[in-house]
C-alpha cells in the first residue's frame, strides 16, 4: 500500500475574497472530508466569495469533485460564489470530463478568477 502525504488546506483573505490553497491528493476518505470540514468552517465564518487553487493537487476523484460541488451550492445559497484555479493537466482533464468546468467557473490563474467576480 502506498501512503500519500495528508491533504494540506490553507486560506487567506483579501478584500472580501477568500483564497484557498490545497496541496495533496483530493480523493475519497480523509482528504475529501478534511476539505469539506475546512470549507464548512470558512462559510460559517462568513466567507461568500471563494477562490480555490487546485494547481498543487496531483489527483482528484469523484469525492473531491463532490466536495467542490457542495461548496459551490453552499456559497450560492448564501449569495456568494466559487471560482476554481486549475492549469492544464490531469486535474483539469478530470474537471473537463465531468463537466465541472461548465458548472463552476474555472480559470488558469488567481488573477483571472478574481476578475471573474
Descriptions of predicted regions:
Residues 116-117:
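A short, charged, amphipathic alpha-helix used as a generic interaction element across diverse proteins
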Residues 1, 9-11, 74, 96:
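Short secondary-structure boundary/capping segments
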Residues 89, 111-112:
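Acidic phosphotransfer microenvironment of two-component signaling modules
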Residues 25-104:
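Amphipathic alpha-helical interaction surfaces in cytosolic regulatory modules
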Residues 105-109:
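Short acidic-hydrophobic, aromatic-tinged amphipathic segments that line or gate anion-handling sites
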Residues 3-37:
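STAS-typified acidic loop motif
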Amino acid at each position: 500500500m502506498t501512503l500519500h502525504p495528508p491533504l494540506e488546506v490553507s486560506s487567506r483573505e483579501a478584500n472580501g475574497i477568500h483564497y484557498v490553497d490545497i496541496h495533496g491528493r483530493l480523493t475519497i476518505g480523509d482528504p475529501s472530508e478534511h476539505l469539506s470540514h475546512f470549507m464548512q468552517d470558512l462559510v460559517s465564518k462568513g466567507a461568500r466569495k471563494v477562490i480555490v487553487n487546485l494547481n498543487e493537487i496531483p489527483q482528484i476523484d469523484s469525492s473531491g469533485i463532490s466536495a467542490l460541488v457542495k461548496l459551490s451550492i453552499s456559497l450560492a445559497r448564501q449569495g456568494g460564489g466559487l471560482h476554481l484555479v486549475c492549469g492544464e493537466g490531469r486535474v483539469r482533464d478530470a474537471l473537463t470530463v465531468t463537466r465541472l468546468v461548465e458548472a463552476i467557473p474555472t480559470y488558469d490563474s488567481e488573477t483571472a478568477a478574481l476578475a471573474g467576480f
